[in-house]
Amino acid sequence: MKVLWAALLVTFLAGCQAAADAPIKVEQPVEPETEPELRPQTEWQSGQPWELALGRFWDYLRWVQTLSEQVQEELLSPQVTQELTTLMDETMKELKAYKSELEEQLSPVAEETRARLSKELQAAQARLGADMEDVRSRLVQYRSEVQAMLGQSTEELRARLASHLRKLRKRLLRDADDLQKRLAVYQAGAREGAERGVSAIRERLGPLVEQGRVRAATVGSLASQPLQERAQALGERLRARMEEMGSRTRDRLDEVKEQVAEVRAKLEEQAQQISLQAEAFQARLKSWFEPLVEDMQRQWAGLVEKVQAAVGASTAPVPSDNH
Protein backbone atom coordinates (compact mmCIF):
# COMPACT_ATOMS: atom_id res chain seq x y z
CA MET A 1 0.00 0.00 0.00
CA LYS A 2 2.84 2.43 0.84
CA VAL A 3 4.45 1.79 -2.56
CA LEU A 4 1.17 2.64 -4.26
CA TRP A 5 0.89 5.86 -2.22
CA ALA A 6 4.40 6.87 -3.24
CA ALA A 7 3.60 6.31 -6.92
CA LEU A 8 0.41 8.31 -6.62
CA LEU A 9 2.21 11.13 -4.79
CA VAL A 10 4.76 11.41 -7.62
CA THR A 11 1.87 11.72 -10.06
CA PHE A 12 0.31 14.32 -7.77
CA LEU A 13 3.42 16.51 -7.61
CA ALA A 14 3.93 16.29 -11.38
CA GLY A 15 0.61 18.07 -11.88
CA CYS A 16 -1.17 15.16 -13.48
CA GLN A 17 -4.39 15.52 -11.51
CA ALA A 18 -7.50 14.27 -13.28
CA ALA A 19 -11.00 15.15 -12.28
CA ALA A 20 -13.37 12.92 -14.22
CA ASP A 21 -13.44 9.16 -14.10
CA ALA A 22 -13.83 6.92 -17.09
CA PRO A 23 -16.95 4.75 -17.08
CA ILE A 24 -16.54 1.41 -15.35
CA LYS A 25 -17.58 -1.70 -17.17
CA VAL A 26 -20.18 -3.61 -15.21
CA GLU A 27 -19.15 -7.04 -16.51
CA GLN A 28 -16.08 -7.28 -14.25
CA PRO A 29 -13.72 -4.97 -12.33
CA VAL A 30 -11.15 -3.52 -14.70
CA GLU A 31 -8.57 -0.78 -14.52
CA PRO A 32 -10.10 2.63 -15.41
CA GLU A 33 -9.19 4.45 -18.57
CA THR A 34 -7.11 7.56 -18.47
CA GLU A 35 -9.17 10.45 -17.09
CA PRO A 36 -9.41 13.75 -18.92
CA GLU A 37 -7.73 16.67 -17.24
CA LEU A 38 -10.26 18.90 -15.46
CA ARG A 39 -7.81 21.43 -14.05
CA PRO A 40 -4.04 21.25 -13.70
CA GLN A 41 -3.30 20.78 -10.03
CA THR A 42 -0.37 23.17 -10.18
CA GLU A 43 -2.84 26.05 -10.50
CA TRP A 44 -3.71 25.77 -6.79
CA GLN A 45 -0.85 23.62 -5.52
CA SER A 46 1.84 25.82 -3.92
CA GLY A 47 3.64 23.24 -1.83
CA GLN A 48 2.12 24.19 1.53
CA PRO A 49 1.99 21.30 4.04
CA TRP A 50 -1.82 21.29 4.11
CA GLU A 51 -1.94 21.12 0.29
CA LEU A 52 0.49 18.21 0.26
CA ALA A 53 -1.65 16.42 2.83
CA LEU A 54 -4.78 17.13 0.76
CA GLY A 55 -2.94 15.76 -2.27
CA ARG A 56 -2.32 12.48 -0.46
CA PHE A 57 -6.01 12.29 0.36
CA TRP A 58 -6.83 13.09 -3.27
CA ASP A 59 -4.55 10.38 -4.64
CA TYR A 60 -5.94 7.85 -2.21
CA LEU A 61 -9.44 8.75 -3.39
CA ARG A 62 -8.36 8.23 -7.02
CA TRP A 63 -7.08 4.79 -6.10
CA VAL A 64 -10.38 3.94 -4.38
CA GLN A 65 -12.29 5.27 -7.37
CA THR A 66 -10.71 2.68 -9.64
CA LEU A 67 -12.80 -0.04 -7.90
CA SER A 68 -10.19 -2.61 -8.91
CA GLU A 69 -10.11 -6.09 -7.43
CA GLN A 70 -7.70 -5.00 -4.68
CA VAL A 71 -9.93 -2.03 -3.87
CA GLN A 72 -13.00 -4.26 -3.80
CA GLU A 73 -11.33 -6.56 -1.29
CA GLU A 74 -10.17 -3.74 0.98
CA LEU A 75 -13.51 -1.92 0.81
CA LEU A 76 -15.04 -4.93 2.57
CA SER A 77 -12.67 -4.27 5.51
CA PRO A 78 -12.42 -1.07 7.56
CA GLN A 79 -8.85 -0.44 6.31
CA VAL A 80 -9.81 2.02 3.58
CA THR A 81 -11.97 4.16 5.83
CA GLN A 82 -9.28 4.09 8.49
CA GLU A 83 -6.69 5.28 5.99
CA LEU A 84 -9.03 8.02 4.78
CA THR A 85 -9.71 9.10 8.35
CA THR A 86 -5.98 9.36 8.99
CA LEU A 87 -5.44 11.40 5.83
CA MET A 88 -8.39 13.66 6.71
CA ASP A 89 -7.02 14.30 10.19
CA GLU A 90 -3.57 15.03 8.78
CA THR A 91 -4.97 17.47 6.21
CA MET A 92 -7.07 19.38 8.76
CA LYS A 93 -4.18 19.45 11.23
CA GLU A 94 -1.79 20.95 8.67
CA LEU A 95 -4.46 23.42 7.58
CA LYS A 96 -5.06 24.58 11.16
CA ALA A 97 -1.31 24.97 11.71
CA TYR A 98 -0.96 27.08 8.55
CA LYS A 99 -3.97 29.18 9.57
CA SER A 100 -2.47 29.78 13.03
CA GLU A 101 0.80 30.86 11.43
CA LEU A 102 -1.01 33.39 9.25
CA GLU A 103 -3.01 34.66 12.23
CA GLU A 104 0.24 35.48 14.03
CA GLN A 105 1.35 37.49 11.01
CA LEU A 106 -1.99 39.34 10.95
CA SER A 107 -1.50 40.88 14.40
CA PRO A 108 -0.81 44.43 13.07
CA VAL A 109 -4.00 44.32 10.93
CA ALA A 110 -7.21 45.90 12.20
CA GLU A 111 -9.31 43.65 14.43
CA GLU A 112 -12.37 43.92 12.19
CA THR A 113 -10.43 42.87 9.08
CA ARG A 114 -8.74 40.02 10.90
CA ALA A 115 -12.09 38.74 12.25
CA ARG A 116 -13.72 38.86 8.81
CA LEU A 117 -10.87 37.02 7.12
CA SER A 118 -10.78 34.42 9.88
CA LYS A 119 -14.53 33.84 9.62
CA GLU A 120 -14.38 33.34 5.84
CA LEU A 121 -11.42 30.99 6.14
CA GLN A 122 -13.14 28.94 8.83
CA ALA A 123 -16.19 28.54 6.61
CA ALA A 124 -14.08 27.30 3.67
CA GLN A 125 -12.19 24.99 5.99
CA ALA A 126 -15.45 23.58 7.34
CA ARG A 127 -16.75 22.92 3.81
CA LEU A 128 -13.59 21.03 2.91
CA GLY A 129 -13.80 18.96 6.08
CA ALA A 130 -17.48 18.18 5.48
CA ASP A 131 -16.84 17.01 1.91
CA MET A 132 -13.95 14.81 3.04
CA GLU A 133 -16.19 13.34 5.71
CA ASP A 134 -18.85 12.74 3.05
CA VAL A 135 -16.36 10.65 1.06
CA ARG A 136 -15.62 8.51 4.08
CA SER A 137 -19.33 8.11 4.86
CA ARG A 138 -20.07 7.00 1.28
CA LEU A 139 -17.42 4.31 1.50
CA VAL A 140 -18.74 3.11 4.85
CA GLN A 141 -22.25 2.96 3.42
CA TYR A 142 -21.01 1.09 0.35
CA ARG A 143 -19.20 -1.46 2.49
CA SER A 144 -22.32 -2.05 4.58
CA GLU A 145 -24.51 -2.50 1.49
CA VAL A 146 -22.02 -4.87 -0.17
CA GLN A 147 -21.78 -6.98 2.97
CA ALA A 148 -25.57 -7.12 3.11
CA MET A 149 -25.71 -8.32 -0.54
CA LEU A 150 -23.09 -11.07 -0.34
CA GLY A 151 -23.76 -13.61 -3.07
CA GLN A 152 -25.76 -11.10 -5.14
CA SER A 153 -24.79 -8.74 -7.92
CA THR A 154 -23.21 -5.50 -6.71
CA GLU A 155 -22.80 -3.87 -10.12
CA GLU A 156 -25.47 -1.25 -9.44
CA LEU A 157 -23.86 -0.36 -6.11
CA ARG A 158 -20.48 0.02 -7.78
CA ALA A 159 -21.88 2.25 -10.50
CA ARG A 160 -23.67 4.39 -7.94
CA LEU A 161 -20.51 4.67 -5.80
CA ALA A 162 -18.44 5.66 -8.84
CA SER A 163 -20.95 8.42 -9.65
CA HIS A 164 -20.91 9.70 -6.07
CA LEU A 165 -17.12 9.71 -5.96
CA ARG A 166 -16.90 11.72 -9.20
CA LYS A 167 -19.23 14.34 -7.77
CA LEU A 168 -17.36 14.42 -4.48
CA ARG A 169 -14.04 14.86 -6.26
CA LYS A 170 -15.39 17.88 -8.12
CA ARG A 171 -16.65 19.32 -4.84
CA LEU A 172 -13.28 18.73 -3.22
CA LEU A 173 -11.55 20.51 -6.10
CA ARG A 174 -13.86 23.51 -5.71
CA ASP A 175 -13.28 23.52 -1.95
CA ALA A 176 -9.52 23.41 -2.46
CA ASP A 177 -9.67 26.27 -4.98
CA ASP A 178 -11.81 28.38 -2.67
CA LEU A 179 -9.62 27.65 0.33
CA GLN A 180 -6.46 28.44 -1.59
CA LYS A 181 -7.87 31.80 -2.75
CA ARG A 182 -8.98 32.76 0.75
CA LEU A 183 -5.61 31.77 2.15
CA ALA A 184 -3.98 33.97 -0.48
CA VAL A 185 -6.12 36.91 0.71
CA TYR A 186 -5.24 36.00 4.28
CA GLN A 187 -1.53 35.93 3.43
CA ALA A 188 -1.74 39.24 1.59
CA GLY A 189 -3.31 40.80 4.68
CA ALA A 190 -0.55 39.34 6.80
CA ARG A 191 2.08 40.77 4.45
CA GLU A 192 0.44 44.19 4.57
CA GLY A 193 0.28 44.04 8.36
CA ALA A 194 3.92 43.06 8.53
CA GLU A 195 4.88 46.04 6.35
CA ARG A 196 2.91 48.35 8.63
CA GLY A 197 4.62 46.81 11.62
CA VAL A 198 8.03 47.44 10.05
CA SER A 199 7.11 51.08 9.42
CA ALA A 200 5.99 51.49 13.03
CA ILE A 201 9.20 49.93 14.27
CA ARG A 202 11.23 52.21 12.02
CA GLU A 203 9.43 55.25 13.49
CA ARG A 204 10.11 54.05 17.01
CA LEU A 205 13.75 53.33 16.30
CA GLY A 206 14.39 56.76 14.76
CA PRO A 207 14.84 58.60 18.11
CA LEU A 208 16.95 55.75 19.44
CA VAL A 209 19.25 55.95 16.42
CA GLU A 210 19.62 59.71 16.93
CA GLN A 211 20.46 59.19 20.59
CA GLY A 212 23.07 56.66 19.53
CA ARG A 213 24.64 59.20 17.19
CA VAL A 214 24.80 61.82 19.97
CA ARG A 215 26.35 59.32 22.35
CA ALA A 216 28.88 58.30 19.72
CA ALA A 217 29.83 61.95 19.19
CA THR A 218 30.29 62.38 22.96
CA VAL A 219 32.50 59.33 23.14
CA GLY A 220 34.50 60.65 20.20
CA SER A 221 35.11 63.97 21.96
CA LEU A 222 36.25 62.15 25.08
CA ALA A 223 38.58 60.04 22.99
CA SER A 224 40.21 63.19 21.64
CA GLN A 225 41.47 64.20 25.13
CA PRO A 226 45.13 63.54 25.85
CA LEU A 227 45.73 60.02 27.04
CA GLN A 228 47.99 61.17 29.89
CA GLU A 229 45.26 63.35 31.43
CA ARG A 230 42.74 60.53 31.38
CA ALA A 231 45.29 58.11 32.85
CA GLN A 232 46.15 60.57 35.63
CA ALA A 233 42.49 61.09 36.49
CA LEU A 234 41.97 57.35 36.54
CA GLY A 235 45.00 56.90 38.83
CA GLU A 236 43.66 59.52 41.26
CA ARG A 237 40.32 57.77 41.43
CA LEU A 238 41.97 54.41 42.02
CA ARG A 239 44.24 55.84 44.75
CA ALA A 240 41.31 57.44 46.57
CA ARG A 241 39.40 54.18 46.29
CA MET A 242 42.30 52.16 47.73
CA GLU A 243 42.74 54.57 50.65
CA GLU A 244 39.05 54.37 51.44
CA MET A 245 39.14 50.57 51.35
CA GLY A 246 42.27 50.50 53.60
CA SER A 247 40.62 52.76 56.19
CA ARG A 248 37.53 50.57 56.25
CA THR A 249 39.68 47.45 56.62
CA ARG A 250 41.60 48.91 59.61
CA ASP A 251 38.39 49.94 61.33
CA ARG A 252 37.00 46.48 60.82
CA LEU A 253 40.14 44.84 62.25
CA ASP A 254 39.91 47.02 65.37
CA GLU A 255 36.31 45.99 65.86
CA VAL A 256 37.24 42.31 65.49
CA LYS A 257 40.05 42.65 68.06
CA GLU A 258 37.70 44.26 70.59
CA GLN A 259 35.15 41.51 70.08
CA VAL A 260 37.82 38.80 70.55
CA ALA A 261 38.99 40.43 73.81
CA GLU A 262 35.44 40.56 75.12
CA VAL A 263 34.90 36.90 74.29
CA ARG A 264 38.18 35.90 76.02
CA ALA A 265 37.24 37.81 79.19
CA LYS A 266 33.84 36.17 79.29
CA LEU A 267 35.38 32.71 78.84
CA GLU A 268 37.87 33.28 81.69
CA GLU A 269 35.11 34.51 83.97
CA GLN A 270 32.96 31.49 83.18
CA ALA A 271 35.91 29.12 83.79
CA GLN A 272 36.54 30.67 87.22
CA GLN A 273 32.88 30.35 88.14
CA ILE A 274 32.87 26.70 87.11
CA SER A 275 35.99 26.03 89.25
CA LEU A 276 34.40 27.63 92.33
CA GLN A 277 31.20 25.68 91.80
CA ALA A 278 33.21 22.42 91.56
CA GLU A 279 35.07 23.13 94.83
CA ALA A 280 31.82 23.94 96.62
CA PHE A 281 30.21 20.75 95.34
CA GLN A 282 33.23 18.71 96.48
CA ALA A 283 33.04 20.21 99.99
CA ARG A 284 29.32 19.49 100.10
CA LEU A 285 29.88 15.85 99.15
CA LYS A 286 32.57 15.56 101.83
CA SER A 287 30.23 16.97 104.49
CA TRP A 288 27.61 14.45 103.42
CA PHE A 289 29.73 11.32 103.51
CA GLU A 290 32.17 11.95 106.45
CA PRO A 291 29.55 11.35 109.24
CA LEU A 292 28.41 8.22 107.47
CA VAL A 293 31.95 6.87 107.25
CA GLU A 294 32.66 7.61 110.94
CA ASP A 295 29.44 5.89 111.99
CA MET A 296 30.30 2.84 109.90
CA GLN A 297 33.80 2.74 111.46
CA ARG A 298 32.33 2.83 115.00
CA GLN A 299 29.86 0.09 114.16
CA TRP A 300 32.64 -2.00 112.66
CA ALA A 301 34.86 -1.57 115.76
CA GLY A 302 32.00 -2.58 118.07
CA LEU A 303 31.30 -5.63 115.94
CA VAL A 304 34.96 -6.64 116.10
CA GLU A 305 35.02 -6.32 119.92
CA LYS A 306 31.91 -8.47 120.23
CA VAL A 307 33.38 -11.14 118.01
CA GLN A 308 36.63 -11.14 119.98
CA ALA A 309 34.74 -11.43 123.29
CA ALA A 310 32.72 -14.32 122.02
CA VAL A 311 35.80 -16.11 120.79
CA GLY A 312 37.58 -15.62 124.16
CA ALA A 313 34.67 -17.02 126.11
CA SER A 314 34.55 -20.14 124.00
CA THR A 315 38.28 -20.90 124.53
CA ALA A 316 38.30 -20.56 128.43
CA PRO A 317 39.18 -23.93 130.39
CA VAL A 318 36.30 -25.92 131.80
CA PRO A 319 36.75 -26.92 135.62
CA SER A 320 37.01 -30.70 136.34
CA ASP A 321 34.75 -32.66 138.86
CA ASN A 322 37.54 -34.78 140.65
CA HIS A 323 37.13 -34.79 144.41
UniProtKB/Swiss-Prot annotation:
List the Gene Ontology MF annotations in alphabetical order: cholesterol transfer activity; heparan sulfate proteoglycan binding; heparin binding; identical protein binding; low-density lipoprotein particle receptor binding; phosphatidylcholine-sterol O-acyltransferase activator activity; phospholipid binding
Provide the organism lineage as a comma list.
Eukaryota, Metazoa, Chordata, Craniata, Vertebrata
Protein name, entry field: Apolipoprotein E
Keyword Transport in the entry? The reply is yes
Q: Does the keyword Transport apply?
A: yes
Where are the stretches annotated 8 X 22 AA approximate tandem repeats? 86-261
Q: Which residues carry this modification: Methionine sulfoxide?
A: M149
Q: SUPFAM superfamilies, per this entry?
A: Apolipoprotein A-I
List the signal peptide residues.
Answer: 1-18
The family line of this record is: Belongs to the apolipoprotein A1/A4/E family.
Q: List keywords of the entry alphabetically.
A: Chylomicron, Endosome, Extracellular matrix, Glycoprotein, HDL, Heparin-binding, Lipid transport, Lipid-binding, Oxidation, Phosphoprotein, Repeat, Secreted, Signal, Transport, VLDL
**Cellular component GO terms held in the UniProt record:** chylomicron; extracellular exosome; extracellular matrix; extracellular space; high-density lipoprotein particle; intermediate-density lipoprotein particle; low-density lipoprotein particle; multivesicular body, internal vesicle
- The UniProt annotation puts the region (LDL and other lipoprotein receptors binding) at 164-174
Which sites bind heparin?
A: L168, R169, K170, R171, G235, E236, R237, L238, R239, A240, R241, M242
Q: What is its main location?
A: secreted
Write down the glycosylated positions: T218
Q: Where are the sequence repeats?
A: 86-107, 108-129, 130-151, 152-173, 174-195, 196-217, 218-239, 240-261
Q: Which PANTHER family match?
A: APOLIPOPROTEIN, APOLIPOPROTEIN E
Region Homooligomerization, annotated ranges: 272-323
Q: What does the UniProt entry say about where the protein is found?
A: Secreted; Secreted, Extracellular space; Secreted, Extracellular space, Extracellular matrix; Extracellular vesicle
- Which superkingdom is the protein from? Eukaryota
The annotated subunit structure for this chain is:
Homotetramer. May interact with ABCA1; functionally associated with ABCA1 in the biogenesis of HDLs. May interact with APP/A4 amyloid-beta peptide; the interaction is extremely stable in vitro but its physiological significance is unclear. May interact with MAPT. May interact with MAP2. In the cerebrospinal fluid, interacts with secreted SORL1. Interacts with PMEL; this allows the loading of PMEL luminal fragment on ILVs to induce fibril nucleation.
Q: Which GO terms describe its biological process?
A: acylglycerol homeostasis; cholesterol efflux; cholesterol metabolic process; chylomicron remnant clearance; high-density lipoprotein particle assembly; intermediate-density lipoprotein particle clearance; lipoprotein biosynthetic process; melanosome organization
**The protein's role, per its UniProt record:** APOE is an apolipoprotein, a protein associating with lipid particles, that mainly functions in lipoprotein-mediated lipid transport between organs via the plasma and interstitial fluids. APOE is a core component of plasma lipoproteins and is involved in their production, conversion and clearance. Apolipoproteins are amphipathic molecules that interact both with lipids of the lipoprotein particle core and the aqueous environment of the plasma.
UniProt organism field: Chlorocebus sabaeus (Green monkey)
- As stated in the Swiss-Prot or TrEMBL entry, residues carrying the post-translational modification Phosphoserine are S153
Region listing for Specificity for association with VLDL, in residue ranges: 284-296
